[in-house]
């Protein structure tokens, strides 16, 4: 508030929480409904008391195939929780699919806003058109993809927006899901040519797209510069084909999918060759990327050392660690993968059709991040 920023608390919803829990003994989700309602209602009251105008409950489990028991549990939970919202507004957010099994149940509850995924939700548009949308609620329409890095096609998106507005639906333009799944900004990418980056939209750029779409939706956009630029971009995408790759794919025969010799024969050959014990010992294939390993790779990337010096360092590391494995008596040795950085990026560099960024990091899990290559062509 001191910075002039209006924040919106976002927490995982009660229904998704109960559906993802693992239950032991005879108790099931319904046995915990009363306690969960009390906890969420208390949390909602605290958010509202602290000045939150909107509170968002994420309920991704609603896009699953739901039973009548699931729907009954969902209704029970939110009838209890929403009874305590007071002057606050509650947004129910869904993503990664549509809510075909419970659309009517959701819209009948006292939510102030409902977020629907219009991209991966194959039936979302159909559900809204066939059943309408309550006039007293706000539809948070997920029309800008929150999972991929590609620019939004304004022409297609504006058609959906106009169709919703024609039904007098109170619409807020939204991403299809959290922007956690995409890199932060294109501003950090200084080495990729514009012929590639002009097709990308990371998190900051997707917010800019939302702002542009909001503006375009309120005007005769067909002659607007932003719309025309976007239309031209999609009409002139560069050729991403690799004829050599396509030729190899076309030449694949059915027998190419059959590995020879047969498994039993390979198994016998390998057992004889390696003579491993019944339970062979080994380690994870990748050893820690220590400071000196990272320093060696960085020096090579900056051109501070030669390729031969880079390879010599890695070979020495491999030799040292093979010796350690032999000394402690491991049966299956690994070479430690000292030549690679992130696994996804490293193997992508061995293939055609990929682009590589400088700082387009995304979360893998927990605090671990990866910088995956971009699939551009064949």
Task: Please state what every model-predicted region is.
Residues 1-378:
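Domain-level signal for soluble alpha/beta catalytic cores
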